Design a protein with these regions (language model features):
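GG-anchored amphipathic helix commonly corresponding to the ABC/SMC/Rad50 NBD signature/C-loop
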Residues: 157-177, 415-416, 491-511
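Coupling and communication elements adjacent to P-loop NTPase active sites across diverse families
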Residues: 2-15, 96-151, 157, 244-360, ...
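ABC ATPase nucleotide-binding domain signature region
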Residues: 37-38, 50-113, 393-465, 543, ...
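Flexible loop/N-cap segments at domain edges
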Residues: 322-368, 373-442, 458-460
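Conserved A-loop
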Residues: 16-17, 23-33, 66, 386-392, ...
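Catalytic Walker B motif of ABC-type/P-loop ATPase nucleotide-binding domains
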Residues: 176-180, 185, 509-514, 519-520
Length: 563
């Protein structure tokens, strides 16, 4: 049964975190989680994931306090799993299964019974929970214990997330913390997650850029420039509140600028009057007869009066300027990018990519999707694949399919990964030489700056040209010298894309594997704008429907699930 809004289940007061080098992550954050589902949003690098780690207890704050309601379950972005981690490890039943195996082999020691306790059907219960979550291997498995022995390395990214999340929920936590839980999930898995969030008996705090998920939350916490703010309602309600604020802020800024201009005019007018009065006074004194003392006193009095007038006008102008600057800080920066990439242009008839998609007659090579299995991303079931796929000119193709259908494997095979090519169900017959590829897991030198990386990718550009291009991608001033290792996940993605787009020779085919994973809403908008400037062919794997809807796709290819 869904929970209702109540007293805070998780709260924190005056929370601060200072990194070892003295850099503050944030200071004096105070807030609470009491709604059924609360979203934590903010720009990349604002500290969202760090705040979750503090609340989960995996990171200690520099100062401040956290009140936790018993057990806090935490699902990090990268899951923190090794390829050898088993499903049994996720459910913490490995020891129980080992004891059951030993017992069945003829070892009847008392210690084994103690290890098993009341958990004789632990594997079956875990399988049932996974099946209820739409975990495909659980639906197909006939041996629960064999399923539990499967390693994470044999699962797709979405299957691993589903298994880890299901295991967390099975612990019945007091609060559930999720960091980008829908990354790598196909449409069916996302729908299952949404249903799960609607029925959880504990409050959830989730970091996500998934627009569909954000529309289902009950409260939004925004972490921006070290300040945490709360908004009642879903993401649309939050955006409406922010838009109203920005309209008011723009109006207040116009008014402040008008007042500042008026104060400047009045200051100039006052100075003009004072100058005229001073000249008139000097002329009068030159024509007046009297003691030097009396004339000096009169001049001194006039100077004091002028100084007082100047001080009054300057004070009013300073106050108006301070107000104008404060109003400017209330305006959120325009994050529009301006990029010209003529080198990526591809002639309409030029062959860019060629794939063989239908091979043999076995079940694994069937060109049709299963009748009972709806394809990922809303594609119709049983859609036939063409025998060959040829991408020509600046076409934009989305590669869709359920988790485990081999999308990422196909991309790696296209890029020449021999191991992926051996396991892929499809063959890459041709790929244009100038191809840029961004995999799900980026590998960038942590000690190099974005300026160094882009200059290495394009030695024909001067440092100033690179800085100009990076500025158009919103990397400005001294930020271009920061080492990649200190950047957020979203910023690292932007650096990786910059090195690809600005490379020499320019890419005529751009391949992106789940590019919006780990990106905040502003960075997703940034990516959409960057791709609008790109004039080559595009091949993208993404479960982000809102993102794909804005790419100007020319076709969608849905891969069947291979069992």
């Amino acid at each position: 049964m869904p929970i209702s809004v109540s007293e805070p289940h998780l709260s924190f007061n005056s929370l601060s975190l200072i990194w070892p080098d003295g850099t503050p992550c944030f200071e004096n954050l105070t807030g609470a989680v009491s709604a059924p589902v609360t979203a934590l949003i903010g720009d990349n690098g604002s500290g969202k994931s760090t705040l979750l780690k503090l609340l989960a207890g995996t990171l200690e704050p520099t100062s401040g306090s956290i009140s936790r309601p018993g057990t806090v379950a935490y699902l990090p972005q990268d899951l923190g799993l090794t390829p050898q981690t088993t499903i049994a490890d996720l459910f913490a039943i490995t020891d129980v299964l080992d004891a059951l195996t030993a017992l069945e082999a003829g070892d009847y020691s008392e210690e084994l019974y103690d290890r098993i306790g009341d958990n004789w059907d632990a594997a079956e219960q875990a399988q049932a929970a996974l099946a209820a979550s739409g975990f495909s291997p659980a639906l197909a498995a006939t041996d629960a214990r064999a399923l539990m022995r499967r390693t994470v390395g044999t699962l797709s990214g979405g299957e691993a997330v589903t298994a880890a999340l299901t295991a967390l929920v099975a612990t019945r936590p007091g609060v559930l913390l999720l960091d980008e839980p829908t990354n790598n999930l196909d449409a069916d898995a996302r729908a299952t997650l949404y249903r799960l969030l609607d029925t959880l008996p504990c409050p959830v705090l989730v970091v996500s850029h998934d627009r569909d998920l954000l529309e289902r939350v009950d409260e939004v916490l925004e972490l921006r420039q070290g300040t945490l703010r709360s908004f009642t309602g879903n993401y649309s309600a939050y955006r409406q509140a922010i838009d109203s604020e920005q309209d008011a802020a723009a109006r207040h800024l116009r008014e402040a600028k008008q007042v500042e201009r008026q104060e400047k005019r009045e200051r100039i007018e006052a100075e003009t009057k004072l100058a005229r009065a001073a000249r008139a006074g000097a002329t009068a004194q030159a024509n007046r007869r009297g003691s030097r003392m009396s004339m000096g006193l009169a001049a001194s009095s006039a100077q004091r009066s002028a100084a007082k007038i100047r001080q009054t006008h300057q004070g009013r102008l300073d106050a108006a300027t301070a107000t104008r600057k404060a109003r400017e800080r209330d305006i959120r920066e325009d994050q529009a990018i301006y990029l010209d990439l003529p080198g990526t242009r591809v002639p309409a008839g030029k062959r860019v990519l060629e794939l063989t998609l239908r091979q043999g007659t076995g079940a694994d090579s069937s060109p049709y999707q299963g009748e009972q299995e709806q394809a990922d991303d809303g594609a119709a079931a049983a859609t036939p694949l063409p025998e060959r796929l040829i991408v020509q000119g600046p076409e934009r193709l989305r590669l869709a399919g359920a988790n485990g259908s081999g999308k990422s494997t196909l991309l790696r095979a296209i890029m020449g990964d021999a191991q992926a090519a051996d396991t892929a169900h499809y063959t890459c017959d041709y790929r244009v030489a100038n191809t840029g590829y961004l995999p799900q897991r980026l590998a960038l030198p942590q000690d190099q700056s974005m300026l160094q990386l882009v200059m290495a990718a394009n030695p024909t550009l001067t440092e100033q040209q690179v800085r100009d291009d990076l500025a158009r991608l919103l990397f400005r001033r001294e930020r271009v010298h920061l080492p990649v290792g200190v950047l957020s996940g979203g910023e690292r993605f932007r650096v990786a894309l910059a090195t690809v787009l600005l490379a020499s020779p320019a890419p005529q085919l751009l391949i992106l594997d789940e590019p919006t994973n780990n990106l905040d809403m502003a960075s997703v908008d940034w990516l959409i704008q960057a791709l609008a400037s790109y004039e080559g062919a595009l091949l993208v794997v993404s479960h982000d429907e809102a993102f794909c809807a804005q790419l100007g796709l020319t076709d969608v290819l849905t891969l069947p699930k291979h069992h």
